[in-house]
Amino acid sequence: MITFSSMLLKLQEFWMKQGCNIVQPYDIPAGAGTFHPATFLRSLDSTPWSVAYVAPSRRPTDGRYGENPNRLGSYYQFQALIKPSPDNIQELYLKSLEYLGLDVKNHDIRFVEDNWESPTLGAWGLGWEVWLNGMEVTQFTYFQQVGGIECNPVAVEITYGTERLAMYLQGVDTVFDIVWGENEHGKTLYRDVHKEAEIEFSKYNFEIADTEMLFAEFNAKSAECLKTIEARLPLPAYDLCMMAASTFNVLDARKAISQTERQNYILKIRELSKGCAELYKAQEEDRNKRVKG
């Protein structure tokens, strides 16, 4: 049986063998792997770029106090981004499942058309969900726009739902029974690593978080992001955009924002991410000269 730790390592190993640079998780909370600058910003460059990484993801509204068998407020995606997109990407994906020990010929694997959109990132793309015996385990997306900018060349993003995939590979019915690792002292389960955090962060995000402080933080990070864009610094500006988005997610979980206001906040974050993307793209030629020395 493959452990959760081994599965993540093998995915990195597989995509590294396909030419992807393995980078580390980003150090700012985000709701999805697409927020990582290695995807959001680097997908805008006109030069080839291939990258893969584990993406710890936080979605406070999805927390369930550790009581739901497959719904979490904090979880892990595995992300691979390849630009330009190879013609055999579906074949490579199936080989990645085989690399994890899955006999793809004896399972019902379906590519179901499902176009993707991220309103806060001004991003959308064409793609599929991948269903493994009736359970969605992966999302494929051919990026058409990121930050409101058309992607040329087009990159393909593969996002694995790692917990769902591990549940299937290990034959368990709840995420908390996933075997995280194993050594001479026995097995470490997902519950040993994460269940208490699910309980405590659910209570914080739904009941305790200081909304007045969070509104002030959102406004401060947004203003600082705009100031940093004006200073022509897209990378720190995008960090501030990510921080504002993360703060919004907690406010959303706290139900501190009405439906009408919610859309306005999403548009504010979209404008910030768009400003970062436009500046990053505009500086591409000069940045390449600086980087190449």
From Swiss-Prot:
<keyword id="KW-0963">Cytoplasm</keyword>
<dbReference type="InterPro" id="IPR045864">
    <property type="entry name" value="aa-tRNA-synth_II/BPL/LPL"/>
</dbReference>
<keyword id="KW-0030">Aminoacyl-tRNA synthetase</keyword>
<dbReference type="Pfam" id="PF02091">
    <property type="entry name" value="tRNA-synt_2e"/>
</dbReference>
<comment type="subunit">
    <text>Tetramer of two alpha and two beta subunits.</text>
</comment>
<keyword id="KW-0436">Ligase</keyword>
<keyword id="KW-0648">Protein biosynthesis</keyword>
<keyword id="KW-0547">Nucleotide-binding</keyword>
<protein>
    <recommendedName>
        <fullName>Glycine--tRNA ligase alpha subunit</fullName>
        <ecNumber>6.1.1.14</ecNumber>
    </recommendedName>
</protein>
<comment type="similarity">
    <text>Belongs to the class-II aminoacyl-tRNA synthetase family.</text>
</comment>
<dbReference type="GO" id="GO:0005524">
    <property type="term" value="F:ATP binding"/>
</dbReference>
<dbReference type="GO" id="GO:0004820">
    <property type="term" value="F:glycine-tRNA ligase activity"/>
</dbReference>
<dbReference type="InterPro" id="IPR006194">
    <property type="entry name" value="Gly-tRNA-synth_heterodimer"/>
</dbReference>
<dbReference type="InterPro" id="IPR002310">
    <property type="entry name" value="Gly-tRNA_ligase_asu"/>
</dbReference>
<dbReference type="GO" id="GO:0006426">
    <property type="term" value="P:glycyl-tRNA aminoacylation"/>
</dbReference>
<keyword id="KW-0067">ATP-binding</keyword>
<dbReference type="GO" id="GO:0005829">
    <property type="term" value="C:cytosol"/>
</dbReference>
